[in-house]
Design a protein with these regions (language model features):
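Chalcogenol-based redox active-site neighborhoods
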Residues: 1-138
Length: 138
């Protein structure tokens, strides 16, 4: 797993942002904010992961000018649409369905619930100079 003090890898990946299909480019978030919180989850609609993302939503993390938030799941863009809409998520939901982003952060699960090459549950916080300031798997 990527650790505190490491340099975070950049990525561009398909995402749902404000109800629209988009590409999330990490470098844009890093340039525009003091910190970026990446919330990795193996799949959408997993009760534990949904509770975590709902807590972030309810805490208003996305309302801070100095912090960007993005969720990353191992599901398709279509699942990300349904998930973001169902739970009214105000931050981007990235579809890391091939596990490339998770792999670059050394967060790829060998297997989970019969699936492979999907993200493990984790939170990674990156500052504006690309340094990982917090990293934890759950």
């Amino acid at each position: 797993m990527i650790g505190v003090g490491d340099t975070a890898p950049d990525f561009i990946a398909p995402a749902v942002s404000d109800g629209t299909a988009d590409e999330l480019a990490l470098f844009r978030l890093v340039e525009a904010h003091d910190a970026v919180a990446l919330l990795f989850a193996p799949a959408t609609f997993v009760p534990t992961c949904t509770a975590e993302l709902a807590a972030v939503r309810d805490a208003g993390w996305d309302e801070r000018d100095d912090l960007a938030v993005a969720a990353l799941t191992g599901d398709s863009l279509y699942a990300a649409f349904a998930y973001a809409d169902r739970f009214d998520l105000p931050f981007s939901v990235v579809a890391d369905f091939h596990g490339g982003v998770a792999e670059s952060y050394d967060l790829l699960a060998d297997s989970w619930e019969g699936h492979s090459e999907i993200p493990r549950r984790a939170t990674v916080v990156i500052d504006c100079d690309w340094t990982v300031r917090f990293a934890e798997t759950t």
